[in-house]
Amino acid sequence: YSPDKPFFMYWAPGAAHGPHHIFKEWSEKYKDKFDGGWDEYRARVFQRQLAMGIIPEGTELTERDSTMVAWDDIPEDEKEFQLRLLDVFAGFVEHTYVQVGKLIDGMDAMGYKDNTIVIYIFGDNGSSAEGQNGSISELLAQNQIPNTISQQMAALDKIGGLDALGTNKVENMYHSGWAWAGSTPFRSTKLVAAHFGGTRNPMVISWPKRIKPDKEIRSQFLHVNDIVPTLYDIIGIQHPEIVNGFEQDQMDGKSFAQTFTNPNAENLKKTQFFDNNGSRGVYHEGWFASTFGPLRPWVSAQKGLEDWNSNEDVWQLYDLKNDFSQAHDLSAEYPEKLAELKELFLNEAKENKDFPIGAGIWLRLHPEDVITSPYTEWTFNQTTTRMPEFAAPGLGKKSNTVVIDLEVKE
């Protein structure tokens, strides 16, 4: 940093992405806090959101998907395992917040806080259901390896039991039920673009010199692609057309700087489309049309993906101005509006080179087509700790031969 020049810092911690690792003293603080299970916790969070004004008055709490398990249906001998997984996650999150606080306090101590804009986004997607039934290894879901909780608990017993959760002995990930509760009041989770439980995140902005603090939640529909246009706007610079000889893509987002001082400012964002593994949606001027797609991220080793036909998907329609949580499908009442938005989605998908729809599903069905390292042999020694997945051997569902040269002292 040079005192006479502005600075830019992008800070993205690994938290609270899986696997969830944290010191035991942090996770122990949350013991007994979630004993009611995810259904009770979701209801409790919903009431607190209403009381704090975080969600609009009249918002409805959406129902659990029929393929998601209720807390009461979890076997009693597995509940302690499921609870401990969330204790670890909660400690992980709090520890992260403390580090954020240190960062802000450091800027304050150096005299930079007053004229520094801090944009704090609490995630990059909805809560992750990739722990599925609760897991000591998040890679089980990524590699579509069938497993049972009894198998995992038996393996856990060999390395320290529940105390091993949160340590480097395992790569634990909480049950998808906790993810669903973490996305209150919305439906669904990460990897679902049809519902805001898969895409929506809180954002807080601080700029003491220019923004007078207030507690009024902004209702404008924003997307992460609006961040850069907003920074360009307040700094007073233009988006470069050419960088290092390369023509740049057009900026998709819109500035929301006008909301800093006016909670009721016009929303310049008119349209935004979404697609994730064939789950898709499109926002336009207060309406949202979406279709769930083939993948339910919380279902272990899901069957039938090869039979999916995107042309047969059923679409829903939501009026977000009056239905914050997407609780009521209005497609039957407004078929013309739905048709309009479906056509808009196709135009946006074409404009953004999104075809073919659901291309990620193909790679789940045909892992041999995933881009991998060109190497066929690796040599590791004691200095090797971790390496990028795409540079490493494919250990998921591929056969490998391992040869170990070992010297054993007698």
Model segments located where?
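C-terminal, low-complexity/hydrophilic appendages and adjacent surface loops
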Residues: 181, 185-201, 274-331, 337
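Substrate-binding rim/cap in mid-to-C-terminal beta-strand-loop elements of soluble/periplasmic
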Residues: 105, 140-266, 313
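Structural recognition of the beta-strand scaffold that forms the well-ordered cores
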Residues: 7-12, 117-121, 185-187, 203-206, ...
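Active-site rim elements
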Residues: 34-36, 85-91, 173, 188-192, ...
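Extracellular glycan-recognition modules
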Residues: 371-410
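Short glycine/proline-rich turn/loop motifs
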Residues: 68-85, 206-212, 321-326, 383-385
